[in-house]
């Protein structure tokens, strides 16, 4: 498997090296980094080239790196059933930088791009129907961003008296607490209060 991935990495560098920023093999997959400007050309090549044959897009997802200037990685996961190989294409983009839609190449990218936009706020230009897919229509923000509050902004509940769903600001019943527990697999070198009762 790794020999086939090494051959593929070498082939891509020789034939389409101008489209690739970097590549490495990790966890049994070839990881290729490219730019938003080159992603469509690279995806088209990977699908159409006889030595590649990546005809199946299995997923598009996002990764949030708030400390980086290019805050998000848009990650495309492709499968070549004929070659039995997988490849991961990473596209680092800034918060306000759009990415061209891959729907024209892989029709299945439609919902994947909608999910990535809904969860992270990454904009896909040329998408036929870019709207929320997992959150409510009036939802504010993008919940998988690392700066999104864990509690959210609003609480949604059914009001039996009003006979409808109501949206209210989140009201925490207790102050925020940091639950920092020891791992049950690590244990301690000392006896915690109450442990002596458990051993008896």
Swiss-Prot record:
Enzymatic class: translocase
Subcellular location: Cell inner membrane
Catalytic reactions on record: a quinone + NADH + 5 H(+)(in) = a quinol + NAD(+) + 4 H(+)(out)
Keywords: Cell inner membrane, Cell membrane, Membrane, NAD, Quinone, Translocase, Transport, Ubiquinone
Pfam families per UniProt: Complex1_30kDa (PF00329)
EC number per UniProt: 7.1.1.-
InterPro entries for this protein: NADH_DH_suC, NADH_quin_OxRdtase_su_C/D-like, NADH_UbQ_OxRdtase_30kDa_su, NADH_UbQ_OxRdtase_CS
Primary location class: membrane
Topological category with respect to the lipid bilayer: Peripheral membrane protein
GO cellular component: plasma membrane
Coiled coil (UniProt feature): none
UniProt family annotation: Belongs to the complex I 30 kDa subunit family.
Assembly, per entry: NDH-1 is composed of 14 different subunits. Subunits NuoB, C, D, E, F, and G constitute the peripheral sector of the complex.
Functional note: NDH-1 shuttles electrons from NADH, via FMN and iron-sulfur (Fe-S) centers, to quinones in the respiratory chain. The immediate electron acceptor for the enzyme in this species is believed to be ubiquinone. Couples the redox reaction to proton translocation (for every two electrons transferred, four hydrogen ions are translocated across the cytoplasmic membrane), and thus conserves the redox energy in a proton gradient.
Name this polypeptide is given: NADH-quinone oxidoreductase subunit C
Biological source species: Rhizobium rhizogenes (strain K84 / ATCC BAA-868) (Agrobacterium radiobacter)
Taxonomic classification: Bacteria, Pseudomonadati, Pseudomonadota, Alphaproteobacteria, Hyphomicrobiales
